[in-house]
């Protein structure tokens, strides 16, 4: 099955990360945004096909900006090798694990946030989670190409592996949690984020060293997982940089 993404930002990122196999542009005139994609593709010697504007409907009915890219699939990294290589020494690490995040928009936004803030690794399960489709890649604005992502059979297996390397495991939940502002994060930190409606499964929460929550100062009761992840990632990495 061929994978297509669309839109200026996602296509530019795919080109820069050498994940783009072909670019489709309108042959009926191009604006500055499309010309930027054209120049980037030419610089990397990526083939360009110029097609009628009407033909873009076969790719998507959403706002494609008349820019579509055929991309190579997301390549997952080997979690065990990555942790073994990067956890040694004195540099801090942040690993994010997802337990049942099924909304593609939330997953894409979370990936973009994780890459922007410098999360070292994102771990997703093979089942019970949104797949890394072109919609997720677009929602991430192409950040899915540059973030280290590992796929595992079961999140529990990933937790056991991280514990064997002395990672501290934090579960994000509002139930019986310690406020984020009262937590001192360890050098090797792993944070688990759960399903948008049900949260982290009890069996997974039971493996956490500490349950943490975001303090609420307003009237709404909760945040979606992508918004919550931004706050959590920032505070963890802020502490690491100030240590």
Describe each model-derived feature in a short phrase:
Residues 1-85:
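N-terminal positively charged helical leader segments and presequences
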Residues 3, 26, 99-100, 125, ...:
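Glycine- and other small-residue-rich loops at beta-strand/loop junctions that grip anionic moieties
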Residues 19, 46, 87-176:
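RNA substrate-binding interface of SAM-dependent RNA methyltransferases
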Residues 12, 17, 138-143, 205-243:
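Structured adenosyl-cofactor binding patch, chiefly the S-adenosyl-L-methionine
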Residues 80-88, 161-163, 181-184:
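Short amphipathic alpha-helix with an adjacent loop that forms part of the alpha/beta core around
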Residues 28, 53-55, 127-129, 175, ...:
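Short, ordered loop/turn segments at secondary-structure junctions
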Residues 170-224:
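Active-site/ligand-binding-proximal alpha/beta "capping" segment
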């Amino acid at each position: 099955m061929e994978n297509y993404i669309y839109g200026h930002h996602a296509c530019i990122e795919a080109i820069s990360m050498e994940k783009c196999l072909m670019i489709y542009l309108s042959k009926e005139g191009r604006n500055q945004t499309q010309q930027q994609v054209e120049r980037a593709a030419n610089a990397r010697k990526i083939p360009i096909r110029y097609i009628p504007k009407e033909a873009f409907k076969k790719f998507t009915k959403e706002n494609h900006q008349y820019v579509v890219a055929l991309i190579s699939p997301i390549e997952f990294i080997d979690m065990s090798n990555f942790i073994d290589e990067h956890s040694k020494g004195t540099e801090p690490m942040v690993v994010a694990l997802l337990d049942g995040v099924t909304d593609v928009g939330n997953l894409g936004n979370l990936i973009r946030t994780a890459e922007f803030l410098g999360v070292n690794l994102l771990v997703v399960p093979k089942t019970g989670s949104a797949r890394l489709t072109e919609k997720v890649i677009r929602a991430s604005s192409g950040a899915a190409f540059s973030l280290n992502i590992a796929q595992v059979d079961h999140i529990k297996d990933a937790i056991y592996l991280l514990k064997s390397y002395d990672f501290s495991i934090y579960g994000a939940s509002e139930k019986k949690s310690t406020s984020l502002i009262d937590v001192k994060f360890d050098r090797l930190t792993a944070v688990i984020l759960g399903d948008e409606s049900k949260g982290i499964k009890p069996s997974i929460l039971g493996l956490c060293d500490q349950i943490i929550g975001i303090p609420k100062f307003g009237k709404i009761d909760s945040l979606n997982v992508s918004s919550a992840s931004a706050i959590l990632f920032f505070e963890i990495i802020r502490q690491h940089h100030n240590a």
